[in-house]
A protein has these predicted regions:
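Surface-exposed amphipathic alpha-helical segments
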Residues: 2, 129-155
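A short, surface-exposed beta-strand/turn
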Residues: 122-130
Length: 155
């Protein structure tokens, strides 16, 4: 089963991300980032997390940046970000994933390790107008991100 964050917990999460690191560069980037968590859920066993982040790219970037380009940018940046949060052996590869009835969505496959625990992430990118949506599916110990993606479907 899954436990979804309440509106109050989401507000806390959106305001407290920078508290999770001592890295000044990460804190500054988070302060300037117009991204917000729209959904956050944790599996009842604590071994899986999924979230949806929405970012307003603005009129200029929103018109020219594709989800594929956004995935490529994220792939280049995610290793540094996870390393700043204490992860080791971080790999990030631009790929594609089937998601919510759409085939081959731009995505980033991530693996990392922290305190002996493996982390697997699939970051899937979608875009509507000037907004990019990143659906992050994260599992610990074993990679079940493809199975997690199947939990989403088009309405």
């Amino acid at each position: 089963g899954w436990v979804f964050y309440t509106a109050e917990q989401m507000a806390e999460l959106n305001g407290a991300l920078a508290d999770g690191t001592d890295n000044a560069d990460v804190k500054a980037a988070l302060a300037d980032d117009p991204s917000i968590f729209d959904m956050y859920a944790v599996s009842t066993d604590g071994l899986m997390v999924m979230n949806v982040v929405i970012q307003n790219l603005g009129l200029v970037s929103g018109a020219v940046v594709s989800p594929q380009e956004y995935a490529e940018i994220a792939s280049a940046e995610v290793a540094d970000t996870l390393t700043a949060y204490g992860y080791e052996n971080v790999t990030a590869q631009t790929t594609a994933a089937d998601f919510a009835g759409t085939e081959s969505c731009p995505a980033v496959a991530v693996t990392a390790e922290r305190d002996g625990t493996a982390l697997y992430e699939q970051m899937i990118y979608l875009k509507t107008g000037n907004y990019v949506y990143c659906v992050t599916l994260c599992s610990f110990k074993e990679d079940v991100t493809a199975e997690m993606a199947k939990l989403f479907y088009a309405l």
